[in-house]
Amino acid sequence: MEIKDQGAQMEPLLPTRNDEEAVVDRGGTRSILKTHFEKEDLEGHRTLFIGVHVPLGGRKSHRRHRHRGHKHRKRDRERDSGLEDGGESPSFDTPSQRVQFILGTEDDDEEHIPHDLFTELDEICWREGEDAEWRETARWLKFEEDVEDGGERWSKPYVATLSLHSLFELRSCILNGTVLLDMHANTLEEIADMVLDQQVSSGQLNEDVRHRVHEALMKQHHHQSQKKLTNRIPIVRSFADIGKKQSEPNSMDKNGQVVSPQSAPACAENKNDVSRENSTVDFSKGLGGQQKGHTSPCGMKQRLDKGPPHQQEREVDLHFMKKIPPGAEASNILVGELEFLDRTVVAFVRLSPAVLLQGLAEVPIPSRFLFILLGPLGKGQQYHEIGRSIATLMTDEVFHDVAYKAKDRNDLVSGIDEFLDQVTVLPPGEWDPSIRIEPPKNVPSQEKRKTPSLPNGTAAHGGPEQHGGHSGPELQRTGRIFGGLILDIKRKAPFFWSDFRDAFSLQCLASFLFLYCACMSPVITFGGLLGEATEGRISAIESLFGASMTGIAYSLFGGQPLTILGSTGPVLVFEKILFKFCKEYGLSYLSLRASIGLWTATLCIILVATDASSLVCYITRFTEEAFASLICIIFIYEALEKLFELSESYPINMHNDLELLTQYSCNCMEPHSPSNDTLKEWRESNISASDIIWGNLTVSECRSLHGEYVGRACGHGHPYVPDVLFWSVILFFSTVTMSATLKQFKTSRYFPTKVRSIVSDFAVFLTILCMVLIDYAIGIPSPKLQVPSVFKPTRDDRGWFVTPLGPNPWWTIIAAIIPALLCTILIFMDQQITAVIINRKEHKLKKGCGYHLDLLMVAVMLGVCSIMGLPWFVAATVLSITHVNSLKLESECSAPGEQPKFLGIREQRVTGLMIFILMGSSVFMTSILKFIPMPVLYGVFLYMGASSLKGIQLFDRIKLFWMPAKHQPDFIYLRHVPLRKVHLFTVIQMSCLGLLWIIKVSRAAIVFPMMVLALVFVRKLMDFLFTKRELSWLDDLMPESKKKKLEDAEKEEEQSMLAMEDEGTVQLPLEGHYRDDPSVINISDEMSKTAMWGNLLVTADNSKEKESRFPSKSSPS
């Protein structure tokens, strides 16, 4: 048989065509020179299994730029067609380059715009005494799902592993089979006629079996979700199914049955029933019904109706349809064995436009691709593997796009070759192909396969993706007074109304209820501590009022409403020092505090006017993590400390003698030696110790009259209290455990997705509610939340407004600027570091941030609170992180086995606004709030602190100290930074964290903001210990000097010029086919040299020779 050259065979046989006709690409049987193979080469071949590159989680928007390469493409085709026999394609024309060229082109119509694909594999099934039918055996959205043998259920999604032999056979099928691109057809029967006519005309199918093949293709399709109607009522039904049915659209008839589209008449003329934009499927036109349907969450509208009673009916799996993205199309793979065939029938069809082929696919979406493989008996498993191969290829992100944009079979073969060039081979002796690989949590991006890059095998020395930098336009200096503030207002104003509309979600309600309980306790506790430190001049009611007023104003007009304002430790330390100073020198505390607050507000406004917030760009991950870790640890420490302090109020007897229980008592007695203060109090209250019946007093009365407790059941100044401390410990740890368990309930396997999502969103609120009910039912008098019940200042000698001067000397107003400078640093650092953490790029915020506007609102409200004698409030790190975590958005339509993709944060103002409105109204809800046990709130604090530690890289690196290298996680920085450098970076960060902790818990806590600022300089000094590349992986790069930037820009320009010169260099092939870089290969050329490919070509030759002895009986159509 005459051997044809590769270039001629790869060229389409119909170079010109009418737009209304399908592109027919016949191809050839040989693409390389004839090769002889040794017997042992063929017999000793072993199957290699390939780990397929899994597709990207959600398909990104495809590039639509206009490529000016059509003329060049035409010229390349003419050049290829003019190659002499035996000529090779140029070495630089690799499949990867051709695929990148294909994906870079833009078509004039929308028919070649890639859509998401649902792929279904059907195999023809023959049973004795029954009519043959097509049975669904596997399906793909992102990962493979198989129908379990005999189980009548779907397998868990898994990553497909393919044999190299089946991929080669698939490539041969595309090369030698029938390829029909952009076929215009409306029914499966039309498609079958066109395919078989082409097969007969090309001599690939005998005319005498055409009719029988046509009948086989038109057999009924049976899907896994299809169930025949019976009179039997299922008795056993799982709760998950019940929940699933309740959560699904109820647009079906009362039985939940719809007509099997296979048995319904097809509408051949109306091809506009399929909408290309949102995949709207109109069943009423195909079935003649009038009943309207329901629009699914993914945008697919079904109009379903019942057919005649004698027709077989099937259920549409609406739960599975929710997982199909909007605009998705179907790819149908039909494979099987037919006893009357003596050779394989192969066809690849792309429809234009996509058509709803009723009954062909499991779900009612339009079909775009069909792959048909029918052959003689005895090769069923081989056909099945080829079908799995093409189905897996259709889920590959790159080949999927190539299939949509391909102009001929050459493009499809290039797509297969590019796929082969990217796969990973698993050794057959070290891997069991029956093992199903679990889908990965994070699917790698395939964008580098779509864009031109360095040659094969050449490592690209690129840097890491910068996720955490703060070099956005929000932090650019404007050089104008209030320039940054004006830009912040312009940036946030367009989103103001959407900040309220976007809050209509159950997730926001859950976040609001949770954070209200979480914010109430620290505000009241802070007010109580402040009341003790200031002798009641600022206490709980002032704290509640100040937090509510400041929070409402900030939530309405702040630049980043996701930030939650709260009280901080350094502020409390400052208040204590200031009160002690005023008491020693006889100054009015509230008046001097008002002067300091007004100066602080003024200085903060000056910082806003001069764009000082742009200095935030020097706060890198190193500083952020140290600060955030410290606040989280403080939350955990204080929660445990508060629980431990309960033992002082509710002591227990650790050494009981059970035999003396009848003698245990604790009585109130008159003090033996009352203090002078006690005697003075008795005289002022006209109380005589001899007139008091001390034995009849209650515990609180005895304490108020300064009596003494005497008896075996008395502790140090208190009577022993049974059960309360232990019950508080149980409530504390039960709250932590239940909150964490319910929060993770979203990833469990029980109940429908909607139920799991709601439980996870309301986890903390449900926990608090359950603990309150249990505590109320048990009846043990645990300590409860104490909320002021009257809205008035704590002390009667003060009002709601304070004059800055008051009784103090005039010079105190001027002197107040000195402590105001320290307060300004405190407010600026606390506010901006928290804002930086909230605005990190990992959170995918879309509405921008407003550092200048945030600082302005804090400054204004600080001045207002100073005049009204209320506490100062600034951004609370842990509460803000918790707020952001409670509003995370994930994709609703996710393929089976695919992890929901993080989409961003639900950015809105309502949750913060409602938290502080309700906080201000808490005075009127005392009768409800008094039932909340304090140990439950302490448990919430511990949970918040521990959950906020997740995602902090510092703690991941700390765990590496105790891990052997082979057991360490595959962190990206461990690939590029030596382990000793990673440990050195961690030790420095831990040392800084320890120093911050020492200062925070000591009397020097007022200088804590100064130490946080010092971390920026410590990070700058680390440039001498680490290279720039190492710091880019371990931390964010700090802004550099202008001179250094210019030098780097010049170097980059020189490198780009050299790269352009290299691209323009013409490389001439040398004698002996010498290759200057052995790592650069052409997968198509190398494949043609393999024994496996040669074996397939020998088989194809035999088929051709057999065909020549039995010529076709029909003429070409």
UniProtKB/Swiss-Prot annotation:
It is found in: Basolateral cell membrane; Apical cell membrane; Cell projection, Dendrite; Cell projection, Axon. It is a multi-pass membrane protein. The modification Phosphothreonine is found at residue 94. Disulfide bonds: none annotated. Residues 59-76 have a biased composition (Basic residues). Glycans are attached at residues 676, 686, 696. GO terms for molecular function: sodium,bicarbonate:chloride antiporter activity; sodium:bicarbonate symporter activity. Keywords: Antiport, Cell membrane, Cell projection, Glycoprotein, Ion transport, Membrane, Phosphoprotein, Sodium, Sodium transport, Symport, Synapse, Transmembrane, Transmembrane helix, Transport. Residues 1-23, 58-97, 282-309, 431-476 are annotated as: Disordered. One of its GO terms (biological process) is regulation of intracellular pH. In the brain, detected in cerebral cortex, subcortex, cerebellum, hippocampus and medulla (at protein level). Expressed in neurons but not in astrocytes (at protein level). Isoforms starting with Met-Glu-Ile-Lys are found predominantly in the brain with lower levels in the eye while isoforms starting with Met-Cys-Asp-Leu are most abundant in the kidney with lower levels in the duodenum, jejunum and ileum (at protein level). Residues 1-508, 559-561, 617-625, 741-761, 830-854, 933-934, 1019-1117 are cytoplasmic. It catalyses: 2 hydrogencarbonate(out) + chloride(in) + Na(+)(out) = 2 hydrogencarbonate(in) + chloride(out) + Na(+)(in). SUPFAM superfamilies: Phoshotransferase/anion transport protein. GO terms for cellular component: apical dendrite; apical plasma membrane; axon terminus; basal dendrite; basolateral plasma membrane; CA3 pyramidal cell dendrite; dendrite; GABA-ergic synapse. Residues 530-537, 583-595, 647-719, 783-808, 876-911, 956-997 are extracellular. The chain crosses the membrane at residues 509-529, 538-558, 562-582, 596-616, 626-646, 720-740, 762-782, 809-829, 855-875, 912-932, 935-955, 998-1018. N-glycosylated. The N-terminal cytoplasmic domain is likely to have a high level of intrinsic disorder. Sodium/bicarbonate cotransporter which plays an important role in regulating intracellular pH. Has been shown to act as a sodium/bicarbonate cotransporter in exchange for intracellular chloride. Has also been shown to act as a sodium/biocarbonate cotransporter which does not couple net influx of bicarbonate to net efflux of chloride, with the observed chloride efflux being due to chloride self-exchange. Controls neuronal pH and may contribute to the secretion of cerebrospinal fluid. Belongs to the anion exchanger (TC 2.A.31) family. This is Sodium-driven chloride bicarbonate exchanger. It comes from Rattus norvegicus (Rat).
